Amino acid sequence: MRKLLVLFLSFVTAIAVAQGIDANTAAKAITAAGLKEHLSIIASAEMQGRETGTEGERKAAAYLTSQYKKFKLKPGNNGSYSLPFTLYQDKVVSSTLKVNGEPYALDKDYWVNASSAPQKSLKTNAIIFVGNDFNDKSTVDVKGKLLVATESKERSIYKIMAAQKLGALGMIIIANNNPSYPSNLTGRLSLKPSAASNFVSMTVSKSLGSRLLGGSKDFSDQELADVPKAVYTTTIDWTAERSNGEVLSADVMAVLPSKEKTDEYMFVTSHYDHEGIKNGVIYYGADDDGSGTASVVAIAQAFAEASKKGFSPKRNIVFMNVSGEEKGLLGSQYYSEHPVYPLEKTSVDLNIDMVGRIDPTYKGDSMNYVYVIGEDKLSSDLQPITDKVNKNYNMELDRRFNDPKDPNRFYYRSDHYNFAAKGVPVIFYFNGTHADYHKPTDTVEKINFDLMEKRVRIIFETAWEMAMKEEMLKRDLPLNMPGR
């Protein structure tokens, strides 16, 4: 009788504890101090900027794994917290470039994606300047010609793709002096060895661009905009030598298992890689995307603590920090092509990429905001849930970047996209860009942790709603993925 009484009281206590857990209470485990503790490690000098495939990134992965083990979350990949993959790197070992007989230096005056370098050499005596609005509707005869274009808000890859489609020999992009070009363009990584291409392309400095277009001095932005679209007599002599290599990287995965819908999943994601070290300077990546990575860890911790008090999700919650985002969303692409869990049984991906800062649009009293991107694309269930959760926080949920005509195309620029491309509903949480974006000055000291706490609590409560929903999210909106 005594044993039955003890069992009965234990059962009643368990029910009472479970009933006492709600999302808003559980979210209070996420604090500004806790976020700062995690981010101060993730974006520390010890992590060396966390470039994909480097020792610094491996240290960051080890830290993430240690936290998930500490929270007693299960390994996310068949008994392992690591989902390893191989990336292929084609490098330009050496290159020479002469324009009208004058030599120019690789990684100073021009930058080359190895797969777009000439097989051996390229010589031409004429170029066609097509400005900043070139597209595949152009009526200019570009077949077999080398084109020169200027950057615009639209990504340059679309101009390059248009040039290839119209049969051009290649395209030169005149840069807006973006300091991230060297690492982004030389030695680019990919999930497959790149095939040799007959189409060539390179990015050049504004100074070299001015010489290509006949300028004896560097053009100002306005002077460059006023250059006529025409054929220019310019002699180009370009050679290149390439090499191939492999880089090993890994996504980090942990899971809070469900006891109910054991074959259904939802994801909370971030990317933990950044830009590494350039010219001896560490690019810390505190906001991009140390903030998202610290957020995923804090959300995982809050769910783990709630589970100790009786919370049990209706479907499995997967916490994943991916690598290779800065190299082209490669870690999430690898997962989408080699999923550990069926994508058709994955209800949603909540992706967190840059949530610790304030962009120039918001300042002062108006900084109580977060950009919410992608919730209108695949499921009509998403926005009502987001709005319901926000009633506890009264934050400005800014949806301006959902506009398909927005030139920034942020929807295509973070890891949720690879889930969406497979039909999985997504929400991307984002604070917008700022002056320290992709610069070594993106440091922990500039993070607004009080605002970050509020943003992350909203994401946590949204994840809670997704985890406890009786049915998976409807996929009732058309899958329209024009490509990045």
Put a short name on every predicted segment.
Residues 1-23:
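Bacterial Sec-dependent N-terminal signal peptides
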Residues 18-76, 97, 257, 476:
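N-terminal hydrophobic or amphipathic helices/low-complexity stretches enriched
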Residues 20-23, 109-137, 194-285, 301, ...:
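Soluble metallo-hydrolase cores and metallopeptidase-like ectodomains found primarily
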Residues 48-143:
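Noncatalytic luminal/extracellular "stalk/propeptide" segments of secretory-pathway proteins
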Residues 105-106, 199-204, 209-217, 322-428:
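Metal-dependent peptidase/peptidase-like ectodomains
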Residues 105-200, 283, 301:
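Extracellular/luminal Protease-associated
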Residues 301, 434-484:
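His/Asp/Glu-rich mid-to-C-terminal helical/loop segments that flank catalytic regions of hydrolases
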Residues 301-328, 349-352:
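Short helix-loop-beta-strand segments that form the rim/entrance of peptidase-like active sites
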